[in-house]
Amino acid sequence: MAAGLDFEATLSEEQTVLVVDIGGGTTDCSVLLMGPQWRDRADRQQSLLGHSGCRVGGNDLDIMLAFKQLMPLFGLGGETAKGIALPALPYWNAVATNDVPAQNDFYSAANGRVLRDLILDAAEPEKVKRLLKVYQQRLSYRLVRAAEESKIALSGQTAISAPLGFVQADLAESISQDQLADAISQPLMRIQEQV
């Protein structure tokens, strides 16, 4: 509701207003009566006509962008030397920074052994070595932050290069607005369902 109070100050008559507040981890939607007659009331319960919310927010968009656009540089979608697909779960857990069990699993000693075995089996071991570096240096949040910075930059540009030099010198990934839209389509649909 606080997200709509600035807007309410601009109203000269009562209106029914949909306030959508997309936070880091949640999206909240409220339908409110707003206007001069409501502005100074401490108790706004009577002006609240409806509310809904979901546990999807901006962080989920960043995580999906990191997973879909950055993780292929770390081996996601790759194969073993025998042509068997590499498991996707370690890649998801690496970027699922809003999921404590997933992060605990990614940073477990058992997963460290899995990653070392994947390097031995992978058709492109240099990519999986990057994932091992994420594991060893606990770089999950930096990866998701790089995705967030890319998302922000793409609001004003049609394509950007996401620098990942903290993983490997000169490592970067080109991301377009279309790729961003594709990557975040699933969590964005959940947000739109609230509206």
What are these regions (language model features)?
Residues 1-20:
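Conserved phosphate-binding catalytic cores of ATP/NTP-utilizing and phosphoryl-transfer enzymes
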